[in-house]
A protein has these predicted regions:
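Long, contiguous, compositionally biased segments that the model treats as domain-scale units
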Residues: 1-122
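Acidic-basic catalytic patches of nuclease active cores, encompassing PD-(D/E)XK
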Residues: 9-23, 254-302
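Charged, structured surface patches that assemble and position nucleic-acid processing machinery
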Residues: 65-81, 100-105, 109-116, 123, ...
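Short, charged/polar micro-motifs that form catalytic or ligand-binding hotspots
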Residues: 93, 267-275, 326-330
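Accessory beta->alpha helical hairpin/"wing" motif in late/C-terminal subdomains of nucleic-acid enzymes
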Residues: 113-130, 232-241, 245-246
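Glycine- and charge-enriched low-complexity intrinsically disordered segments
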Residues: 139-190
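Interdomain/boundary linker segments immediately adjacent to catalytic/signaling cores
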Residues: 182-275, 280
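Catalytic core segments in nucleotide and nucleic-acid processing enzymes
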Residues: 279-282, 286-287, 292-419
Length: 419
């Protein structure tokens, strides 16, 4: 976080902050404490600010609203009285502030250039838990928390924090020019290598991974390496397209061509992220001698990502369902976790692996009520989850042990029947 911000403040909003009937007009209360972040103003300081309100209904990256905050001492000209610092927002930002309610949380971050980012996250939401995770703030009961020593912030997994920083308008550069030559040598003139071959190459680059002793750490290493390698190749390929320009034969700007390129980048990223995660999970399962089948149909068009131990066992109604397992995989969830609930009717408890680093208690309670169990790499089990949630989560190592035990029990049953 220190690469992007000089400091930040986190404030749980009170009624006086958001209720026009009881608030100081367009002012965030508790402004004295903001001085630790913003410094002592001399005269009025007009701070360029990008703002947004975030909740779990968000489907795409929000368009941050550009405005100004005013930071000043209302008593600067009155030396006989103590300072009265005020942080004001303009009426043009009312459409954002009016969505907020008491109990929501405000995040105010100062970029290296002195500009501010202000986002408000809905109380009890998953996006709030994710922002608390990425800022390393678990002081959820504090009215106001300020951090200016960014060197003290705990490091975060790059691939997990990238999407969250994008919500704040921060472009995280995960490219590595040192990898480009080896990628181009390996794939030659192939524009976009297939996901299976690119994933396999990424795994070959990672040294000291142990998918048997440390499947959780190995998955994070492989996914992280492929993500970095793909972004490096993507930057190279897109730079080529941009260098060619977006002018048609008559020299007119080809807007449609530009939009087509932008959309293709967006779609390719989404598609490859999910497919590459499946590739790495498959390799870990195979290395651990776990029997499974990928993307096989169960009922009708239902097609779980992973089915254990086999399609034949699933289709054999004499094979006990307690020895069957299914696993879905999604890099992030939102409400898409519900999609796996209707897959594989014979299996009452569903499993879903995700790389999402934080989830609200309300959402995990819904998952438990629907008999869904999350599998999350252990590196992500920490600050984004409460102790109660952590006790419920499975690591990938836990999941492998569970599936292996069911496979052994099912094999013993089949042998007993044959005997």
């Amino acid at each position: 976080m220190g690469d992007y911000f000089k400091g930040f403040a986190v404030k749980v909003l009170a009624d006086v902050d958001v209720n026009k009937l009881s608030s100081n007009q367009h002012e965030f209360n508790g402004s004295r404490a903001f001085r630790e972040l913003l410094g002592t103003p001399h005269g009025k300081k007009y701070l360029p600010t990008r703002m947004a309100y975030l909740d779990d209904d968000l489907e795409e990256l929000p368009e941050l609203f550009e405005t100004f905050l005013t930071w000043y001492d209302a008593r600067e000209s009155n030396a006989a009285r103590g300072p009265e610092f005020r942080l004001l927002y303009r009426a043009e930002a009312d459409h954002i502030i009016n969505r907020a309610a008491a109990g929501d949380t405000l995040f105010l971050a100062e970029e290296e250039n002195g500009n501010l980012i202000l986002v408000i996250a809905k109380k009890g939401s998953t996006i709030l838990r994710q922002l608390q995770w990425v800022f390393d703030v678990q002081h959820t009961d504090d009215v106001l928390f300020v951090a200016t020593d960014m060197g003290m912030q705990a490091p975060r997994e790059e691939i997990a924090s990238e999407e969250l920083l994008a919500l704040l308008g921060i472009d995280v550069d995960l490219t590595d020019d040192g990898l480009l030559d080896s990628i181009l040598r390996r794939f030659g003139e192939k524009l976009w290598p297939s996901t299976p071959e690119f994933s396999a190459y990424a795994r070959s680059v990672v040294k000291h991974a142990d998918p048997v002793r440390d499947p959780d750490g190995t998955l994070m290493q492989w996914v992280g390496m492929e993500h970095r390698m793909f972004r490096t190749l993507e930057k190279y390929r897109i730079s080529e397209s941009i260098a060619d320009g977006f002018l048609d034969a008559e020299g007119v700007v080809d807007v449609e061509g530009f939009l087509k390129l932008s959309l293709s980048v967006h779609n390719r990223r989404k598609a490859r992220a999910g497919l590459s995660l499946e590739e790495h999970i498959s390799t870990i399962l195979k290395t651990n001698d776990i029997s499974f089948v990928k993307k096989t149909k169960t009922e009708g068009k239902k097609e779980p990502d992973f089915l254990f131990p086999s399609k034949a066992a699933y289709g054999d109604l004499g094979f006990p369902s307690q020895f069957l397992t299914m696993l879905g995989s999604k890099t992030s969830l939102k409400d898409r976790w519900r999609q796996v609930l209707n897959e594989a009717n014979r299996i009452p408890q569903k499993h879903l692996l995700t790389l999402q680093p934080a989830i609200s208690e309300d959402q995990t309670a819904e998952m438990q009520a629907e008999n869904l169990r999350l599998v999350i790499p252990r590196a992500l089990h920490g600050a984004g989850f409460t102790p109660a949630q952590q006790g419920w989560l499975l690591g990938l190592d836990d999941f492998i042990l569970e599936v292996r035990a069911r496979e052994i029990a099912g094999t013993h049953l089949e042998q007993a029947v044959l005997a």
